[in-house]
Amino acid sequence: MVQINEVKDTQTRESRTAAHTHIKGLGLDEHGIAKRVEGGFVGQSDAREACGIIVDLIKSKRMSGKAILLAGAPGTGKTALALAISQELGPKVPFCPIVGSELFSAEIKKTAALMENFRRAIGLRIKETKEVYEGEVIELTPEEAENPLGGYGKTISHVIVGLKTAKGTKSLRLDPSIYESIQKERVSVGDVIYIEANTGSVKRVGRSDAYATEFDLEAEEYVPLPKGEVHKKKEIVQDVTLHDLDVANARPQGGQDVLSMMGQLLKPRKTEITDKLRSEVNKVVSKYIDQGVAELIPGVLFIDEVNMLDIECFTYLNRALESSIAPIVVLASNRGMTTIRGTDDDKKSPHGCPADLIDRLLIVRTLPYNQEEIKIIISKRATLENLIVTPDALDKLSLHGINNSLRYALQLLAPAGVLSKTAGRNEITSEDIEECEILFLDSRRSIKILEETKGYL
């Protein structure tokens, strides 16, 4: 008997669950009212409705250059709200998330790093109409002429290419420079190609499937005969950010030899983009917008832990928000009255931000969760992580969410799942949670031990 073994696919990968994998949107109805449990959110109705209004303002392009502050205690869903805003806006609107401490670097100034992220959050949609000739090559004849410089040699004056589609055929008389592109692509009769009328670039799509019965040593990609006319107009839409344009102009392309490539690899410092270069890019962008070729899309810059910024960054942020090209800035802070970095210790400010910036912000408050809401959040996370939790264990975890923190309660899920499997159970029980409590300390118990042992474990 012939043995047949099934080959298992080794490429399939388990999807990793991050802290905010369960967030799918703000969970609002058609009237903008928050549903109690929707889109991965539980509660926080006022904050979600406020964010829904902000999303509508962003979509109608009436929010650029304004800033929002998400203020609330740790573990109340500030980062989740910012992530939900980005998902409501969709993939076409740029969303740039950063943490306050990311801006401090030895290579680049903090204000330059802040401006770089500002430019990353502003998109440019460029619409271009291209005239294209597409079809199967039925004729390829270069026409020669006498060399104008004299001598016996001849030069190619033009090339005649016949293209065929399902609707008809066309004969094109092309420039000799296009013939060079045809030779580079190794185009022969029977190939399907397309030629861009504006640039003259030639692309070989593949071999026509009419020749699929031919035997060839080289593996060919056979494509069907193009439909429609030979001459077509295609509208191509490209989405880029202003930072992409800055980088493209800041790094001029060197030669293709080994020395220049090695020189680019061994550059010790990051290239700092100057204000002059940015203003030149802005001029070109404004010209494109005036011509109707491009459209500016203000995105979202999310700065988490905004209290980590210093007074210089805040001063720069004030100026950047008032510039003509600015994204929507969403800030998040879990501090109350605290000192601003880079100022005197005795001067305290709300949320760690200066008073003049606070005046420019729309503040959205997030509230702590109650036990019932924590229960729903834990059960949702358990479902996402393919864990079954008994009602007793769920009650115990929700108490941890109230007494300690929601994060601690959620972090106990995975180790409790391992302990239940070790014990031969399919579901997490209260015994597993109790064992996890002994093995893993929460912050309060850890602080108490440190106080009792006078700084030593």
Swiss-Prot record:
Its EC number is 3.6.4.12. SUPFAM superfamilies: P-loop containing nucleoside triphosphate hydrolases (SSF52540). ATP binds at G72, A73, P74, G75, T76, G77, K78, T79. It catalyses: ATP + H2O = ADP + phosphate + H(+). This is RuvB-like helicase 1. Belongs to the RuvB family. GO terms for molecular function: 3'-5' DNA helicase activity; 5'-3' DNA helicase activity; ATP binding; ATP hydrolysis activity. Gene3D superfamilies: 1.10.8.60, P-loop containing nucleotide triphosphate hydrolases (3.40.50.300), RuvB-like helicase, domain II (2.40.50.360). Keywords: Activator, ATP-binding, Chromatin regulator, DNA damage, DNA repair, Helicase, Hydrolase, Nucleotide-binding, Nucleus, Transcription, Transcription regulation. DNA helicase which participates in several chromatin remodeling complexes, including the SWR1 and the INO80 complexes. The SWR1 complex mediates the ATP-dependent exchange of histone H2A for the H2A variant HZT1 leading to transcriptional regulation of selected genes by chromatin remodeling. The INO80 complex remodels chromatin by shifting nucleosomes and is involved in DNA repair. Also involved in pre-rRNA processing. GO terms for cellular component: Ino80 complex; R2TP complex; Swr1 complex. It comes from Debaryomyces hansenii (strain ATCC 36239 / CBS 767 / BCRC 21394 / JCM 1990 / NBRC 0083 / IGC 2968) (Yeast). It is an enzyme of class 3 (hydrolase).
